[in-house]
Design a protein with these regions (language model features):
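Short, conserved active-site loops that position catalytic residues or coordinate cofactors/metal ions
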Residues: 36, 41-50, 82-85
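The substrate-binding groove and active-site-proximal loops of carbohydrate-active enzymes
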Residues: 56-59, 86-95, 192, 230-232
Length: 288
């Protein structure tokens, strides 16, 4: 039986109206992901959801309630793969609102044994104090992860690649990933963000393989300000990346998200198509 599972990330739906299109509709996302053949889902805990976007609390809304979340997952035979906690974390210590979001996430995850606490940096600009702020990110991620580990959770840090992201290039990775405390957090390589940051995916995986405990898949076109393509149509060799995981006896989730333009208009359809693509192309590699 395969030790690798395939899940879906809610960001595919978040893009429509910057959260407004599918606000408080996590049950719908769970349903579609299940229909696509995914067995898990990874929602976000977006700290700025209410204050900056005018959406529901943490972009979970009613599903901040662990009972409501569990009921929706159970109705579709789905697992909570993890929660992606999104904060800036570039101050000297966690801001009060960031700490509140982190503590909420830790408390919610206590109801879902085995689900990952993902820490994701909210892009906050690269124009000033870059080195200090990168180190702040590592310090704050370590602090969150230490509290979560003390609560019995497993954690993983997820960098990204928008132009304003603090952790997007080889130099950024060298600073931040080497400053993570491996006793409390691993690393989630997002292969699309790695290539967008100008790095080779396999070389980067090799360099930091001791930290890999979660992974995100999305495809990359290299064209335009949002250089994404639907899974299987871009420049990434997902077969090779998946073989890399199998060869290293990776156990855990492959979380698929799609940021291609077509996904903005039709996140359901793209998720269904990507589920089929994974089943046909990647499931055989992992033994599903």
């Amino acid at each position: 039986m395969s030790k690798i599972k395939f899940g879906s990330q809610v960001y595919t739906w978040f893009m429509q109206g910057t959260g407004k299109g599918y606000d408080n509709k996590l049950d719908h996302m769970i349903k579609v992901a299940a229909e696509a053949g995914f067995t898990g889902i990874e929602p976000m805990v977006l700290e700025i959801s209410e204050s900056a976007l005018g959406c529901g609390k943490y972009w979970l809304g009613d599903f901040c309630d662990p009972i409501k979340l569990k009921d929706s997952l159970d109705a579709h035979n789905m697992t909570l793969a993890g929660l992606a906690l999104v904060c800036a974390w570039d101050g000297e210590e966690e801001a009060p609102n960031e700490r509140a979001a982190a503590d909420f996430t830790i408390d919610l995850l206590k109801h879902f044994p085995g689900a990952m606490l993902g820490t994701v940096t909210l892009p906050s600009g690269r124009t000033s104090d870059l080195q200090r702020r990168r180190l702040n990110v590592a310090r704050n991620v370590n602090a969150v992860s230490r509290r979560a580990t003390d609560a019995g959770l497993v954690c993983s840090y997820h960098p990204n690649s928008p132009p304003a992201s603090l952790v997007r290039t080889q130099e950024d990775y060298d600073v931040v990933l080497s400053s993570l405390d491996p006793s409390v957090t691993g690393w989630t390589p997002d292969v699309g963000h790695i290539i967008r940051g100008g790095m080779d995916v396999i070389a980067t995986l090799n360099k930091w393989q001791h930290l890999v405990n979660h992974i995100h898949y999305k495809d990359y076109s290299g064209n335009g300000p949002e250089p994404w393509s639907q899974m299987g149509t871009g420049k990434l060799d997902f077969h090779k990346i998946t073989e890399w995981l199998v060869q290293r006896n990776y156990e855990g989730w492959i979380i698929c998200e799609d940021e291609a333009h077509v996904a903005v208009d039709d996140p359901d359809g793209v998720t269904l198509q990507n589920g089929i693509w994974c089943k046909e192309n990647l499931h055989p590699i992992v033994g599903l």
